Amino acid sequence: MANIKSQKKRIRQNEKARLRNKAVKSSLKTAIRKFREAAEAGNVEEAIILQRAAARQLDKAVSKGVIHKNQAANRKSAIAKRLHQLQQSQAA
């Protein structure tokens, strides 16, 4: 345990940030999992809605500094690609 007052405060702040980041990452995983499940089930309409929601949550996580913008871009690209494949398979 730190003896310096400012370090004690940093420990408290870091713990709060860790819990906040953990909650945001957990909700991101849930949003992406829901999209993936809808896509695997072949439900295009629901997948479109869930893809938008997941992309929105990824952007919010970037603005809060929870994840890097490139990681969010890669994840958004992957789910957009998956949605496009689903739409193409439904159209064919």
UniProtKB/Swiss-Prot annotation:
Keywords: Ribonucleoprotein, Ribosomal protein, RNA-binding, rRNA-binding. The keyword RNA-binding applies. Belongs to the bacterial ribosomal protein bS20 family. Binds directly to 16S ribosomal RNA. The gene is rpsT. One of its GO terms (molecular function) is small ribosomal subunit rRNA binding. One of its GO terms (cellular component) is cytosol. Residues 1-22 are annotated as: Disordered. InterPro entries: Ribosomal_bS20, Ribosomal_bS20_sf. One of its GO terms (biological process) is translation. Pfam families: Ribosomal_S20p (PF01649). Disulfide bonds: none annotated. SUPFAM superfamilies: Ribosomal protein S20. The keyword Repeat does not apply. Residues 1-11 have a biased composition (Basic residues). This is Small ribosomal subunit protein bS20.
